[in-house]
Amino acid sequence: MDRFVWTSGLLEINETLVIQQRGVRIYDGEEKIKFDAGTLLLSTHRLIWRDQKNHECCMAILLSQIVFIEEQAAGIGKSAKIVVHLHPAPPNKEPGPFQSSKNSYIKLSFKEHGQIEFYRRLSEEMTQRRWENMPVSQSLQTNRGPQPGRIRAVGIVGIERKLEEKRKETDKNISEAFEDLSKLMIKAKEMVELSKSIANKIKDKQGDITEDETIRFKSYLLSMGIANPVTRETYGSGTQYHMQLAKQLAGILQVPLEERGGIMSLTEVYCLVNRARGMELLSPEDLVNACKMLEALKLPLRLRVFDSGVMVIELQSHKEEEMVASALETVSEKGSLTSEEFAKLVGMSVLLAKERLLLAEKMGHLCRDDSVEGLRFYPNLFMTQS
């Protein structure tokens, strides 16, 4: 902790903000200290920590002071952490929260998640070393320490050791890649054989497809799901998480909405999305918050709330006038319809069918007969035969 210096938190000239995350606690080695709830900012030059309650409490450390970083997984009652190993403090260091420390590393505890994306972006900055190409003001230059990530190796022995480490890392990556590829090929082969079997039976008409084969085929399709679902561990628990989730929802719901006439109830969306996400289940609250951002992000979907409180997702191209005109035409053909009868005719849920009929009634195209037999809708003759 003696590597940190007090700062205003303002970015210097040529310094750019990369990512930030709330709810981060700092450990001095394994020891808990008073800095337990703050916002951690990563710039091209520094790690900056600002207290969430007292914004005047702000400190920073140069990325050039970092030797290397590593991840520490979450445990029972413990948050995931990033361990940051540091060079010794320079002799001309400016004042900070600690003048000395026995530890050569700190831990960043992410109580509100987001550590995966933060670790990735920090690793990128340590690799690219942009602080070397974009010098900033003298106030930061004076605190520049030894260059991180470099192994002090002299002569042929050092070169050989470095080459050996690089070779081992390459071998490990290749082995893992081929192992994953083998598993993928086995699964793909099973899917191809099953698909051919079903297609041949349909083509040759040599018998019905058994129920077991249908279930197996559907399970393969569902297991494909979303390849990389948006999670709190990746994007944290704030607005960024809901924005990324909204973009992913727009991608996976486009085709199902087109197949269902351009509209789906939020309950249907919830079931469909969680089925595709597999183990990474989504809470109803997160789904609603993400759907509220669809229109603001100019995505092809939008959230709509009917007067009854029913929430639906619909395509931006879905027109209310066409929906009402279609409902009026169907009811006029049959003379009168209940919500259940209308739902069977148009192939949608009873909930959405009722909302469509109520909307047509609100616009004056239909009228109702609410009796002991239930709610029945009729064409409004005052409008159609005027």
Swiss-Prot record:
Consequence of changing residue 70 to A: Reduces affinity for ubiquitin up to 10-fold
Result of changing residue 67 to A: Reduces affinity for ubiquitin up to 10-fold
Effect of residue 10 to D: No effect on interaction with ubiquitin
Subcellular location: Cytoplasm; Endosome; Late endosome; Membrane
One term of GO molecular function: ubiquitin binding
Coiled-coil parts of chain: 160-185
InterPro entries: GLUE_dom, PH-like_dom_sf, Snf8/Vps36, Vps36, WH-like_DNA-bd_sf, WH_DNA-bd_sf
Chain ranges of the GLUE N-terminal domain: 1-88
One Pfam family it belongs to: EAP30
Keywords: Coiled coil, Cytoplasm, Endosome, Lipid-binding, Membrane, Nucleus, Protein transport, Transcription, Transcription regulation, Transport
Listed GO biological process terms: macroautophagy; membrane fission; multivesicular body assembly; protein transport to vacuole involved in ubiquitin-dependent protein catabolic process via the multivesicular body sorting pathway
Domain GLUE C-terminal span(s) in chain numbering: 105-138
Example of a GO cellular component annotation carried by this entry: extracellular exosome
Keyword Transferase: no
UniProt entry tagged with the keyword Transcription regulation: yes
Family: Belongs to the VPS36 family.
Subunit structure comment from the entry: Component of a complex at least composed of ELL, SNF8/EAP30, VPS25/EAP20 and VPS36/EAP45. Component of the endosomal sorting complex required for transport II (ESCRT-II), composed of SNF8, VPS36 and two copies of VPS25. Interacts with VPS25, SNF8, TSG101 and CHMP6. Interacts (via GLUE domain) with ubiquitin. Interacts with RILPL1 (via the C-terminal domain); which recruits ESCRT-II to the endosome membranes. Interacts with ECPAS.
Domain notes: The GLUE domain (GRAM-like ubiquitin-binding in EAP45) mediates binding to ubiquitin and phosphoinosides.
Function: Component of the ESCRT-II complex (endosomal sorting complex required for transport II), which is required for multivesicular body (MVB) formation and sorting of endosomal cargo proteins into MVBs. The MVB pathway mediates delivery of transmembrane proteins into the lumen of the lysosome for degradation. The ESCRT-II complex is probably involved in the recruitment of the ESCRT-III complex. Its ability to bind ubiquitin probably plays a role in endosomal sorting of ubiquitinated cargo proteins by ESCRT complexes.
Listed name of the protein: Vacuolar protein-sorting-associated protein 36
